[in-house]
């Protein structure tokens, strides 16, 4: 019988079931199976019905290795339905396989092949007709339980760091049901066959059009519109895995509001794309641009990397913006290196005083004569690095071109729209594209693509970032040094980059999944030692690179910020958030553009909170410094008037002329004067911090009731520090980071390994992700958040937290318990609420640079975030009460109420000074009068408060001062007449005057 007799068209020789049993044409049967061959399981084809027959292969070498694709994320354990089908298949084939193998051991006999093929055909027809299971066989990164059960099949020489998704999944059939065949009763070879070989079904076509049978059947079974999470409008399930209940009752159900605000055409794929099914990879250049983009989409091998590229393209505002940014970054690097090299080796500074032209001080052939040895070697190294960057740019252009075609032809989004288009619309277009063409060439990707929704997309894009958020919030990293000034944990960008390289590069493999060795408790000591070695190696490399990095960044910061500080000296007091603050403020699954906008909006409130606290000691010192510097500048400027040509070049000290000192002292004077606080601010730090919390999402329980304390302000300033201090720390970090990597971080290696193992949660279709990013916590009062709708969960957060939710479902959530577990759980719940608000609130459907049109954001540049606009004219104009100009509503609450005896609306005239009558008007003074607003028909009165208010009963504890005596020059401020006359006044003036200011 010919082997091709049973081969179906479009199968491409992918059927490997029969070849694994009968295709071993050698006399010696090898009981070990090719593990990589197990990763290629085609989909069941429902539309082909009972015509599912499979071709056999002469040997395992006949399988095209190029067509075998690494499973990206279908890393789950089998569901119950798949287990039932697998067991039926094993039981159906067991007699035939046993007869064929235990008889004459003729594995290559034609009769045995025909019998088993006929039995396989009948059983497959029965399974297809009686089963509607279209799930994909689970291939990929195994869960930890499956790893322990299947360790017997792994080769001893297999690399421990090989990711789980690259290993073949050995399906277990032990003790799941009573009728399962016991593997222990069979030889190892039979167990291999029973556990690994299933009847292979006809492979799905590479592409399916929008009107394909499978798609129509799926649409009929799941009839109804879909929302942004890829779920139906009724009976919606939002988050979770395929085997877990998801959040229900969410306002994400609103389907049409996205297309109403930003109308986009749904992806319209080609009507006839059957030609693409047989197009190999080496001939995709013959396809049109749209067909090639569709071919790339169908051949996605790693959905994590693909979605990260899609998001980075959106974040970079399209093809031309990204390319321009990369080119300008290379130009910046070239400029810094060449300018610094030229100024250091090609200029003869000794000729500057006597020369009048640039050509007089330039050294000829400086690159060949002046630059030698060590410097020239590193210049050549720099040239080589620039060449690598240019080559990388070439490949980036090709990759970005493919992404541009994907956006343009498949998502119907142009580059011009990316700057104003919300990310939610991009997800919506991805879901439409998935609905039209969910099938791919890589069959194990089908289930992953069927899980495309807002939550899963965020988990894939931020798989690493979610772990980093939890890592930095857990405070398990030791970043201090046992030397003065460095005993506290200070995170800098340099140290953050090294941690990301050492930790994340060690925990995750090249495909973006956690390595097997990290998840196994038995390999904890091995991974801990390897991570320690990695830290120490990174520290050694940083020591070697430190001199060059310090030189480069000093020049870069000098060129970037010198002119800013020169033209705007007040900007030296500008503040920004530290790197550790950004990680503490960021929520799980919060994409970078959302976080960046939120943090940028918080700076106004953060400055207001810091500026509320007086800085009298600093002001006094700066006033003295500005006075001294200003005095010297004035003297030098005055002397310059008499002889401007000669005096400007007059040397006050060795090689330091008058111009030098005028420049230096003038800069110091300008900085000190602009740093002095001269404005008046309303002091209400509690209300300001609560408003600031709406943007930072950070308000520790320890701060409660102490918002007005100086120590709380200092603690906040550690997170919101001066920019000049942060820059100095970055430069210092270039020299300190090697020692932190060598001495401090290795002690945290064990806790880091435990952190990843304990905080990793397996999700079917996603793989291992940070458990807090799944928003699934069952240990809060024994309730499962997946079974709660958003309103119920929001109310629960409001009860547990110390703050209340506002109308936009924003929770002000702080922990009641100070344990690390409760703090982590509280942050997870908080992240869930804000995630729902970002994706379900139509007001947040804005681009990366736009503000939502809602209350709380300034409409104009002059508008303030707070209701505390301070104006002396407004606050103290006649008829106003200064007490009403507090930020909070509690200004006139308990403890702040104005005495009824003072502000009596019934008869206000009784409370004023009875000594002042109408005659005072003649004397040039005005009484406080009360005007009753009869038109309003209420008891509200408008008071006109003038100078006589000081003489009234508004201050009952003070002695009543005769107003006429105040006009007398012999009257002092204490109610006592000066006995000394004019001399007494002069003495009193010098006693209380502010001469030093």
From Swiss-Prot:
<feature type="transmembrane region" description="Helical">
    <location>
        <begin position="621"/>
        <end position="641"/>
    </location>
</feature>
<feature type="modified residue" description="Phosphothreonine">
    <location>
        <position position="794"/>
    </location>
</feature>
<keyword id="KW-0968">Cytoplasmic vesicle</keyword>
<feature type="modified residue" description="Phosphoserine">
    <location>
        <position position="787"/>
    </location>
</feature>
<feature type="compositionally biased region" description="Polar residues">
    <location>
        <begin position="29"/>
        <end position="39"/>
    </location>
</feature>
<feature type="modified residue" description="Phosphoserine">
    <location>
        <position position="842"/>
    </location>
</feature>
<feature type="modified residue" description="Phosphoserine">
    <location>
        <position position="969"/>
    </location>
</feature>
<keyword id="KW-0445">Lipid transport</keyword>
<keyword id="KW-0597">Phosphoprotein</keyword>
<keyword id="KW-0813">Transport</keyword>
<dbReference type="GO" id="GO:0034045">
    <property type="term" value="C:phagophore assembly site membrane"/>
</dbReference>
<feature type="topological domain" description="Cytoplasmic">
    <location>
        <begin position="560"/>
        <end position="620"/>
    </location>
</feature>
<feature type="cross-link" description="Glycyl lysine isopeptide (Lys-Gly) (interchain with G-Cter in ubiquitin)">
    <location>
        <position position="121"/>
    </location>
</feature>
<dbReference type="GO" id="GO:0031966">
    <property type="term" value="C:mitochondrial membrane"/>
</dbReference>
<feature type="modified residue" description="Phosphoserine">
    <location>
        <position position="792"/>
    </location>
</feature>
<dbReference type="GO" id="GO:0000139">
    <property type="term" value="C:Golgi membrane"/>
</dbReference>
<feature type="modified residue" description="Phosphoserine">
    <location>
        <position position="864"/>
    </location>
</feature>
<keyword id="KW-0472">Membrane</keyword>
<dbReference type="GO" id="GO:0034497">
    <property type="term" value="P:protein localization to phagophore assembly site"/>
</dbReference>
<dbReference type="GO" id="GO:0061709">
    <property type="term" value="P:reticulophagy"/>
</dbReference>
<dbReference type="InterPro" id="IPR007241">
    <property type="entry name" value="Autophagy-rel_prot_9"/>
</dbReference>
<feature type="cross-link" description="Glycyl lysine isopeptide (Lys-Gly) (interchain with G-Cter in ubiquitin)">
    <location>
        <position position="113"/>
    </location>
</feature>
<feature type="transmembrane region" description="Helical">
    <location>
        <begin position="377"/>
        <end position="397"/>
    </location>
</feature>
<feature type="topological domain" description="Cytoplasmic">
    <location>
        <begin position="398"/>
        <end position="538"/>
    </location>
</feature>
<feature type="cross-link" description="Glycyl lysine isopeptide (Lys-Gly) (interchain with G-Cter in ubiquitin)">
    <location>
        <position position="138"/>
    </location>
</feature>
<feature type="compositionally biased region" description="Polar residues">
    <location>
        <begin position="221"/>
        <end position="233"/>
    </location>
</feature>
<comment type="function">
    <text>Phospholipid scramblase involved in autophagy and cytoplasm to vacuole transport (Cvt) vesicle formation. Cycles between the preautophagosomal structure/phagophore assembly site (PAS) and the cytoplasmic vesicle pool and supplies membrane for the growing autophagosome. Lipid scramblase activity plays a key role in preautophagosomal structure/phagophore assembly by distributing the phospholipids that arrive through ATG2 from the cytoplasmic to the luminal leaflet of the bilayer, thereby driving autophagosomal membrane expansion. Required for mitophagy.</text>
</comment>
<feature type="modified residue" description="Phosphoserine">
    <location>
        <position position="657"/>
    </location>
</feature>
<dbReference type="GO" id="GO:0006869">
    <property type="term" value="P:lipid transport"/>
</dbReference>
<feature type="region of interest" description="Disordered">
    <location>
        <begin position="29"/>
        <end position="88"/>
    </location>
</feature>
<feature type="transmembrane region" description="Helical">
    <location>
        <begin position="657"/>
        <end position="677"/>
    </location>
</feature>
<feature type="modified residue" description="Phosphoserine">
    <location>
        <position position="144"/>
    </location>
</feature>
<dbReference type="GO" id="GO:0034727">
    <property type="term" value="P:piecemeal microautophagy of the nucleus"/>
</dbReference>
<keyword id="KW-0072">Autophagy</keyword>
<feature type="modified residue" description="Phosphoserine">
    <location>
        <position position="831"/>
    </location>
</feature>
<keyword id="KW-0832">Ubl conjugation</keyword>
<feature type="compositionally biased region" description="Acidic residues">
    <location>
        <begin position="79"/>
        <end position="88"/>
    </location>
</feature>
<keyword id="KW-0496">Mitochondrion</keyword>
<dbReference type="GO" id="GO:0000422">
    <property type="term" value="P:autophagy of mitochondrion"/>
</dbReference>
<feature type="intramembrane region">
    <location>
        <begin position="539"/>
        <end position="559"/>
    </location>
</feature>
<feature type="cross-link" description="Glycyl lysine isopeptide (Lys-Gly) (interchain with G-Cter in ubiquitin)">
    <location>
        <position position="701"/>
    </location>
</feature>
<feature type="topological domain" description="Cytoplasmic">
    <location>
        <begin position="678"/>
        <end position="723"/>
    </location>
</feature>
């Amino acid at each position: 019988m010919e082997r091709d007799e049973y081969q179906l068209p479009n199968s491409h020789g992918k059927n490997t079931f029969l070849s694994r049993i009968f295709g071993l044409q050698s006399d010696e049967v090898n009981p070990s199976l090719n593990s990589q061959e197990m990763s290629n399981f085609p989909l069941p084809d429902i539309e082909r019905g009972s015509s599912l027959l499979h071709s056999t292969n002469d040997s395992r070498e006949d399988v095209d290795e190029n067509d075998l694709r690494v499973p990206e994320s279908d890393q789950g354990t089998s569901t119950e339905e798949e287990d039932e089908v697998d067991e039926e298949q094993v039981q159906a084939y067991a007699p035939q396989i046993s007869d064929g193998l235990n008889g004459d051991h003729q594995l290559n006999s034609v009769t045995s092949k025909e019998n088993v093929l006929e039995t396989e055909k009948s059983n497959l027809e029965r399974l297809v007709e009686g089963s509607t299971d279209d799930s994909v066989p689970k291939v990929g990164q195994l869960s930890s339980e499956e790893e322990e059960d299947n360790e017997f099949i792994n080769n001893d020489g297999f690399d421990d760091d090989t990711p789980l998704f690259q290993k073949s999944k050995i399906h277990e059939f032990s003790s799941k049901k009573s009728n399962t065949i016991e593997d222990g009763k069979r030889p190892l070879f039979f167990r291999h066959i029973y556990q690994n070989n299933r009847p292979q079904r006809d492979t799905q076509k590479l592409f399916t059009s929008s009107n394909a049978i499978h798609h129509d059947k799926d649409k009929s079974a799941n009839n109804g519109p879909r929302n942004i999470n890829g779920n139906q409008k009724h009976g919606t399930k939002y988050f979770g895995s395929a085997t877990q209940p998801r959040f229900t009752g969410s306002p994400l159900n609103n389907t049409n509001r996205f297309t109403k605000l930003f109308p986009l055409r749904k992806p319209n794929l080609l009507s006839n794309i059957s030609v693409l099914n047989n197009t190999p990879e080496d001939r995709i250049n013959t396809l049109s641009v749209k067909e090639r983009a569709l071919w790339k989409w169908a051949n996605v091998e790693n959905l994590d990397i693909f979605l990260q590229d899609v998001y980075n393209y959106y974040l970079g505002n399209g093809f031309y913006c990204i390319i321009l940014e990369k080119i300008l970054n290379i130009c910046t690097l070239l400029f810094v290196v060449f300018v610094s090299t030229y100024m250091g080796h090609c200029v003869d500074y000794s000729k500057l005083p006597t020369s009048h032209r640039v050509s007089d001080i330039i050294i000829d052939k400086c690159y060949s004569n002046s630059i030698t040895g060590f410097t020239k070697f590193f210049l050549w190294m720099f040239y080589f690095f620039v060449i690598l960057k240019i080559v990388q740019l070439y490949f980036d252009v090709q990759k970005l071109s493919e992404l541009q075609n994907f956006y343009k032809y498949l998502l119907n989004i142009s580059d011009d729209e990316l700057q104003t288009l919300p990310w939610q619309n991009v997800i919506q277009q991805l879901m439409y594209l998935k609905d039209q063409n969910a099938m791919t060439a890589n069959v194990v990707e089908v289930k992953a693509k069927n899980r495309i929704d807002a939550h899963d997309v965020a988990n894939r894009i931020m798989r690493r970032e979610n772990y980093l958020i939890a890592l930095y919030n857990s405070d398990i990293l030791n970043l201090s040094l046992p030397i003065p000034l460095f005993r506290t944990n200070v995170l800098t960008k340099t140290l953050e980059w090294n941690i990301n390289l050492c930790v994340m590069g060690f925990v995750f493999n090249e495909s973006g999944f956690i390595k097997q060795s990290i998840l196994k408790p038995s390999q904890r000591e091995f991974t801990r030692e390897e991570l320690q070695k990695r830290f120490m190696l990174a520290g050694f490399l940083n020591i070697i690179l430190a001199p060059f990095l310090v030189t480069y960044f000093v020049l870069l910061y000098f060129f970037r910020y010198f002119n800013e500080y020169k033209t705007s000296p007040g900007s030296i007091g500008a503040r920004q958030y530290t790197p550790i603050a950004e990680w503490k403020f960021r929520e799980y699954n919060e994409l970078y553009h959302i976080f960046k906008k939120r943090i940028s909006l918080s700076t106004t409130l953060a400055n207001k909170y810091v500026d509320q606290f007086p800085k009298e000691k600093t002001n006094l010192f700066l006033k003295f410094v500005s006075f001294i510097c200003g005095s010297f500048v004035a003297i030098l400027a005055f002397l310059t008037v008499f002889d401007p040509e000669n005096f400007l070049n007059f040397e006050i000290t060795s090689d330091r002329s008058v111009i030098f000192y005028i420049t230096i002292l003038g800069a110091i004077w300008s900085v000190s004067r602009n740093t002095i606080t001269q404005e008046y601010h309303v002091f209400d730090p509690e209300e300001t911090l609560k408003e600031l919390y709406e943007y930072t999402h950070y308000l520790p329980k320890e701060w409660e009731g102490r918002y007005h304390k100086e120590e709380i302000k200092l603690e906040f300033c550690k997170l919101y520090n001066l920019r000049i201090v942060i820059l100095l720390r970055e430069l210092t970090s270039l020299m300190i980071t090697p020692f932190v990597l060598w001495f401090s971080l290795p002690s945290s290696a064990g806790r880091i390994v435990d952190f990843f193992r304990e905080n990793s949660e397996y999700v079917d279709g996603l793989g291992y992700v940070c458990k807090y990013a799944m928003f699934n916590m069952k240990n809060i009062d024994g309730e499962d958040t997946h079974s709660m709708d958003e309103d119920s969960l929001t109310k629960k957060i409001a009860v547990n937290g110390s703050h209340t939710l506002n109308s936009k479902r924003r929770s002000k959530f702080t922990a009641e318990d100070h344990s690390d577990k409760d703090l982590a759980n509280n942050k997870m719940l908080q992240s869930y609420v804000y995630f729902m608000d970002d994706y379900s609130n139509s007001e947040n459907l804005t681009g990366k640079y736009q503000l939502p049109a809602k209350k709380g954001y300034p409409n104009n540049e002059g508008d303030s975030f707070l209701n505390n606009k301070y104006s002396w004219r407004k606050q103290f104009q006649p008829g106003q009460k200064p007490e009403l100009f507090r930020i909070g509503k509690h200004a006139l609450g308990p403890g702040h109420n104005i005495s009824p005896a003072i502000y009596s609306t019934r008869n206000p005239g009784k409370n004023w000074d009875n000594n002042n009558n109408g005659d005072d008007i003649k004397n040039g003074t005005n009484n406080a009068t009360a005007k009753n607003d009869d038109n309003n028909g209420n008891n509200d009165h408008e008071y006109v408060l003038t100078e006589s208010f000081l003489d009234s009963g508004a201050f009952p504890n003070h002695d009543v001062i005769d107003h006429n005596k105040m006009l007398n020059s012999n009257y002092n401020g204490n109610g006592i007449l000066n006995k000394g006359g004019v001399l007494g006044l002069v003495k009193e003036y010098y006693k209380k005057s502010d001469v030093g200011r």
